[in-house]
Amino acid sequence: MKISFRRLELSRFTLRVLWLEKDVAIAVDQIVGKGTSPLTSYFFWPRTDAWELLKAELEKKSWITEAERIELLNRATEIINYWQEEGKNHPVSEAQKRFSDVSFVGTA
């Protein structure tokens, strides 16, 4: 049931991830019709504190509910932790399989 709640909450948004050798970058897009519209710029980890910057950017958008912000930040945390702990040593295709609801591009 929790998975259904997550999908319902995130259905207005999607995460975009740049999967790089020395960094991972996360941005949020809003889903509009059958397309997407950029909502934030990319925030890079570990170059900057991507999670804190993303949190601050989402908090500026008062029309995003607290539940949606929490779900987006939780998902960003999962991606950053995966990249940090094991993912940076694996190709982007493996990350895409693990996080199938996220849009990935990368060179690593």
From Swiss-Prot:
GO terms for molecular function: structural constituent of ribosome. Keywords: Ribonucleoprotein, Ribosomal protein. InterPro entries: PSRP-3/Ycf65_sf, Ribosomal_PSRP3/Ycf65. It comes from the Bacteria. The keyword Secreted does not apply. The keyword Ribosomal protein applies. One of its GO terms (biological process) is translation. GO terms for cellular component: ribonucleoprotein complex; ribosome. Part of the 30S ribosomal subunit. Belongs to the chloroplast-specific ribosomal protein cS23 family. Probably a ribosomal protein or a ribosome-associated protein. HAMAP family: Ribosomal_plastid_cS23. NCBIfam families: PRK02724.1 (NF002740). This is Probable small ribosomal subunit protein cS23. It comes from Thermosynechococcus vestitus (strain NIES-2133 / IAM M-273 / BP-1). The lineage of its organism: Bacteria, Bacillati, Cyanobacteriota, Cyanophyceae, Acaryochloridales.
